Design a protein with these regions (language model features):
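Select transmembrane alpha-helical segments in multipass membrane proteins
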Residues: 21-26, 61-69, 141-155, 185-186, ...
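N-terminal alpha-helical transmembrane segments of multi-pass membrane transport
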Residues: 1-76, 86-93, 104, 396, ...
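Alpha-helical membrane segments and immediately flanking helix-loop junctions
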Residues: 56-88, 114-132, 136, 150-153, ...
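Extracellular/periplasmic helix-exit of transmembrane alpha-helices
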Residues: 111-118, 220-238, 246, 250-253, ...
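Flexible loop linkers connecting adjacent transmembrane helices
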Residues: 37-61, 84-86, 90-94, 98, ...
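Helix-loop-helix module between adjacent transmembrane segments
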Residues: 27, 31-32, 100-125, 131-195, ...
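Membrane-interface loop-to-helix entry segments
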Residues: 23-30, 34-47, 166-172, 179-240, ...
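Transmembrane helix-loop junctions in multi-pass membrane proteins
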Residues: 3, 35-39, 77-82, 158-168, ...
Length: 449
């Protein structure tokens, strides 16, 4: 097992080297400029996300699609992932993670647009879409579309399943002394009860769960920052300065480098918001929407909530707590978050427990849908039920697995998904601009396709 972990560590290091960082950030920046900074429409996007298009075609509402995407996106990457980035890359990783989210809004917009533009309608009226359909229908590259689908089906077991199940089991054991085997069995049953109902069941549960969990977590983080108010200025300075000058972090962070801060900040940023990975467009394609741009805007709002708000708050809580309480061990990402939050009496530990349990479970639900659609693309509908059984079983396995192995596997799969998806976005940018001009720039958002 250690040999496999060492191998995955090497592969992850290669995949997340400078070429990948340049490709991902380059795509974010290119689309930001090409689409005239779609970030400026973020509040319009938020308003659209709570509106319904009842006369539009699709399987779920725009909010249902967004809630499912957010459920899959807001997971341990927002809590443990941020802490791991800080432990490995220093406080500067928070800034890189945040920047990945800000510029990633443009990429998430582009993904959502292509999801609607290239989606297909099955014989039973179900909408299917995502990067695999964009690669096949937009570029004619079915071979690359199949590769993306395979990577997605496998990635679901990493970022969407075992990582999340492991986090739930760890929290349950450390907080309440519950055996990982018992936790794994319970989460298996809960997952099966929801995912067997299909996308509408998943969207319904996520639509109820996401607003509640996000509200309480954000409110709790704001309270902790209020308690740490005297250290916020120092935390901001440390995050910004150490992103470009690691020596500015001082203390135990001095071993980090700019490359490490960028690599782990960007990698965990992608893990957190999934902009450029190609996962969210799979459920965006099922949305009821009048035109591609409306759903593109709704999709982009997910990255704003996930990284610009939640990840930034988590990073500030951790860094300000480390400054306020120098005895915190920040060398281990898995324990850093718990140590930072536990320093806040009454609120810290319950908030972390609530956040990890709800965020992780919702991610398991959302990623099951992604994996199913990927399998359906390259193997056919008849394989979906078997995939569900394996996926639900993997929840139990993930509960008792080695965490380091799980994270390395997830990093590898994330990168392998992102590469073909980013290629499709760059090659099809002309279509993205054309649709944006047609509906957004000319003020025709209410016009149907």
């Amino acid at each position: 097992m250690q040999c496999l972990n060492d191998f995955l560590t090497e592969v992850s290091g290669l995949l997340w080297g400078w070429p990948m960082i340049i490709l991902l950030l380059g795509t974010h920046l290119f689309l930001t400029i090409r689409l005239r900074f779609p970030q400026r429409h973020i509040f319009k996007a938020i308003r659209l996300s709570v509106k319904r298009d009842p006369d539009a075609t699709g399987d779920v509402s725009q909010f249902g699609a967004l809630a499912t995407a957010l459920a899959a996106t807001i997971g341990t990457g927002n809590i443990i992932g941020v802490a791991t980035a800080i432990a490995l890359g220093g406080p500067g990783a928070v800034l890189w993670c945040w920047l990945t989210g800000v510029f990633g809004i443009a990429t998430k917009y582009a993904e959502g647009l292509l999801a609607i533009k290239c989606r297909v309608k099955t014989k039973n009226g179900k909408m299917l879409g995502g990067p695999m359909y964009a690669l096949e229908r937009g570029l004619g590259w079915r071979w690359l579309a199949i590769l993306f689908a395979v990577f997605t089906a496998l990635a679901a077991f990493g970022i969407g399943n075992t990582v999340q199940a492991n986090a739930i089991a760890t929290v349950a054991q450390e907080s309440y002394g519950v055996s990982p085997y018992i936790t794994g069995a319970i989460v298996c049953l809960l997952t099966g009860a929801v995912v067997l109902g299909g996308v509408k069941s998943i969207a319904r549960v996520c639509g109820m769960l996401v607003p509640v969990m996000a509200f309480f977590y954000v409110a709790g983080c704001v309270y902790i920052l209020f308690v740490n108010a005297d250290y916020l200025g120092a935390a901001f300075r440390m995050i910004v300065l150490s992103a470009f000058s690691p020596e500015a972090a001082g203390g135990g962070f001095v071993g980090s480098t700019v490359m490490m801060a960028a690599r782990f900040g960007i990698a965990r940023g992608l893990f957190s918001n999934e902009s450029g990975m190609g996962s969210a467009p799979i459920v965006a394609a099922a949305a009821q929407t009048k035109n591609p741009v409306r759903q593109a805007l709704v999709s982009s709002s997910g990255t704003f909530w996930d990284t610009v708000v939640i990840c930034a708050l988590t990073g500030l809580v951790i860094v300000s707590s480390v400054i306020a309480y120098p005895d915190i061990d920040f060398s281990n990402g898995a324990t850093l978050t718990k140590a930072a939050f536990s320093k806040i009496p009454y609120v810290g530990t319950p908030l972390l427990t609530f956040g990890l349990l709800t965020f992780s479970f919702s991610t398991i639900l959302g990623w099951c849908y992604y994996g199913e659609r990927a399998v359906e693309y390259f193997k056919g509908r008849q394989w979906v039920k078997g995939y569900r059984v394996i996926y639900i079983t993997a929840v139990f396995v993930g509960s008792v697995m080695n965490l380091a192995l799980v994270w390395n596997l997830a990093d590898c799969m994330n990168a392998l998904m992102a590469i073909p998806n980013l290629i499709s976005l760059l090659c099809l940018n002309g279509i993205i601009v054309h649709e944006t001009r047609k509906y957004l720039w000319k003020g025709r958002l209410d016009k149907a396709m």
